[in-house]
Amino acid sequence: MPTINQLVRKGRQKPVYVNKVPALEACPQKRGVCTRVYTTTPKKPNSALRKVCKVRLTNGFEVISYIGGEGHNLQEHSVVLIRGGRVKDLPGVRYHTVRGSLDTAGVKDRKQARSKYGAKRPK
């Protein structure tokens, strides 16, 4: 426990806040254009081909974004909406594409958790 004199000299240090999604610039989502759509493999204990795309945002940032859900219609020059949210087993992937908005189609035949994948209510 510091003395009053030590606190007068030094003061308490504020914890440094590190922004986890700097490219969004305090916005909930950002629009961008796909520059490359490809698959990549996850870190050690997991095994899959994860669908990701490199996106050039409207503010000039170039980020890697994960495409969730089964199947997608994205290709180069597709306009996508990006939200925050990292993928734990893909290093460098700190953003998600929003399904069902702009050029990104919703997931077909999705019955549960539809709002997360831009799927309409089945008849």
Swiss-Prot record:
PANTHER family: 30S RIBOSOMAL PROTEIN S12 FAMILY MEMBER. This is Small ribosomal subunit protein uS12. Residues 104-123 are annotated as: Disordered. GO terms for cellular component: ribosome; small ribosomal subunit. InterPro entries: NA-bd_OB-fold, Ribosomal_uS12, Ribosomal_uS12_bac. One of its GO terms (molecular function) is rRNA binding. The keyword RNA-binding applies. One of its GO terms (biological process) is translation. Keywords: Ribonucleoprotein, Ribosomal protein, RNA-binding, rRNA-binding, tRNA-binding. Part of the 30S ribosomal subunit. Contacts proteins S8 and S17. May interact with IF1 in the 30S initiation complex. With S4 and S5 plays an important role in translational accuracy. It comes from the Bacteria. Residues 113-123 have a biased composition (Basic residues). Belongs to the universal ribosomal protein uS12 family. The keyword Isomerase does not apply. It comes from Neisseria meningitidis serogroup B (strain ATCC BAA-335 / MC58). Coiled coil: none annotated.
